[in-house]
């Protein structure tokens, strides 16, 4: 044995063991807290074909969007963006699949999704980890023959825009934007408190002109 090697101090070894024990306990505690932390709920507002120039938070002097402005003030507002295809249904399929139009499309018809490209959508991934998912609003994505959108959500309620104002059972008219929100509120009313949820509210009114030109209808009515 080499007598020149220093002997380890029992005090130092004991102290080191205590430090390692404390660090290990802290790591296990933090890891357990993170594992037990509830996943965030997701509310996805998608305004179809809406340009930033029609939002108050981007400086429009006339259009009133107070709720969107409030979300922008509390969150992140992007000043630059890029899309691979400036077509409404391509952007929707890109969001659902995570693939660009050139990636998911059928040869010779790039805006039509291939079956294998849309076999599993992002709501399917959320469902696998315990989320309850809902879809309300405009669908209109070019999917392959036999594709069923309702199979990819726990609750699926498409709402179209022709006409924008829908006649209700009591004879009154209700705008499709309000109906989309109504469906989402009903979804939340049936939601279990211990389960995370993901709601997709895909609005359609900003996509095209409202053909209902009766005076006094809507926030910006025809004269």
Regions found by a protein language model. Name each.
Residues 24-27, 31-223:
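Formylglycine-dependent sulfatase
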Residues 2-23:
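Bacterial N-terminal signal peptides that target proteins for export
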């Amino acid at each position: 044995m080499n007598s020149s090697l220093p002997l380890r101090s029992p005090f130092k070894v004991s102290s080191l063991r205590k430090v390692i024990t404390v660090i290990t306990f802290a790591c296990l505690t933090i890891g357990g807290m993170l594992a037990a932390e509830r996943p965030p709920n997701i509310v996805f507002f998608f305004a179809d074909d809406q340009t930033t120039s029609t939002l108050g938070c981007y400086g429009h002097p006339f259009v009133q969007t107070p709720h969107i402005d409030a979300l922008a003030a509390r969150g992140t507002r992007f000043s630059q963006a890029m899309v691979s295809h400036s077509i409404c249904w391509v952007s929707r399929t890109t969001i659902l699949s995570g693939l660009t139009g050139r990636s998911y499309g059928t040869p010779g018809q790039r805006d039509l999704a291939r079956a294998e490209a849309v076999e599993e959508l992002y709501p399917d991934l959320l469902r696998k980890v315990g989320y309850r998912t809902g879809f309300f609003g405009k669908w209109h994505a070019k999917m392959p023959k036999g594709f069923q959108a309702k199979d990819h959500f726990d609750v699926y309620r498409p709402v179209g825009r022709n006409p924008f104002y829908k006649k209700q059972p009591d004879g009154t008219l209700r705008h499709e934007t309000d109906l989309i929100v109504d469906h989402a509120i009903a979804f939340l009313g049936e939601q279990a408190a211990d389960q995370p949820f993901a709601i997709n509210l895909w609005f359609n009114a900003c996509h095209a002109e409202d053909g209902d030109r009766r005076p006094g209808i809507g926030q910006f009515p025809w004269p």
